[in-house]
Amino acid sequence: IDALEAEHTGLSVVPDARSRPRQRLATYLLELLADEWLIVAACWERWFFSEDGRAPSHRAFNEQQWGAIFGVGQSGLARRAAGARFFEDAFGISQARSNPRGPFAGLIQLGCTDATEPAWRDSLHRVLQALERHFDTHDYVLGGRPSLGDFGLLGPLYAHFYRDPVPGFALRVFFPLVCEWVERTNGEGCLGARRYGQKLYSVAADGSLEGRCGTSDEGDWLAEDAVPETLMPVLRTFFEEMWPFLKASIEALQRYVESAEHTRGEELPRKTFTATPGFEALQTGEGALTVPFEIGGVRARRMVVPYQIWMLARLAEAIRDCDRERLAPWLAQFPNGEEILELEARLEGVRVRKVGGRLFSA
């Protein structure tokens, strides 16, 4: 998105720092929440229903999807068989409950265990309920025009929920307005989706066709830098659940890069849903790159993901030119919300450099 924004400057999906600071910050917070927090419950939904003996099961669907990669050019059933072989060889899927590997081990490392799984699902459902109410009034996150926040949310909600048969069915049954938004934001055909830029027509008094904007809020973000009240419960999830974990992650990563175990400039664990090979001892158990966290009143432990620290630095840079006096009162409604304004200082001792898909301390 950053690359596309730089190349196509006509109509931005990122609100301007000076004229729309609250909306700008809100979109970056939503991107981070969706990409790195909602994804935990999304991965659970993806893999739980692929385990042996689960009912309902979307194992065959997942095998077919992965088989498209590992069985290119083969017949349909041969592709599915290729996906099934990969699941067994790489993930040991038939023994996922007794000897978790691959994404099944990754869920534990991300803090989604038998003890915390209900809390993760409850958190996800609260977010979906809030979004269902929000999309009753607004077609996109900030009104009638898509933003970075929409595309951030689209990642897990489209790929892991909407497309997968089991969670996708539940999404359609319980959150149909969220489904409409998925189709609208992804540019798919849907009678009620009202895509951005679409016009609706009616017959005027003189018999001519009269066009009007097809999306809510006159096809634009809300005026005067307003963030919809219906979006507040979603943003509150960031501050109540994710932000305490991120603060602990910053401190843990700083201790590690300043320790004798690491030399500045060396490689760090990558963005992944499992502990990075070579860093397993650090990112599992009581390793130096694990921290305690809490979700839904349940305390547990999970791995630190340096990519999230890189994303926080990106957020800090994005709001550097924003008017703090306009942001502070808005942030005050969230638990410890104003701490975001001191993000650059908090990250001073733990900078992360990204080179392609690799991460290094800086």
Please report, for each region that a protein language model flagged, where it lies by residue:
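GST-like domain detector, emphasizing the conserved glutathione-binding G-site
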Residues: 1-81, 141, 161, 215-362
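All-alpha helical catalytic cores of prenyl diphosphate-utilizing isoprenoid enzymes
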Residues: 83-103, 114-131, 151
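GST superfamily/GST-like fold recognition
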Residues: 103, 141-161
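Globin-like tetrapyrrole-binding proteins
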Residues: 107-108
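Alpha-helical packing segments of well-folded alpha/beta enzyme cores
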Residues: 120-127, 131-134, 181, 234, ...
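Cytochrome P450 catalytic-domain "roof"
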Residues: 132-142
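Short His-centered aromatic/hydrophobic patch
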Residues: 134, 156-191
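Conserved catalytic/binding loops enriched for acidic/polar residues
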Residues: 197-200
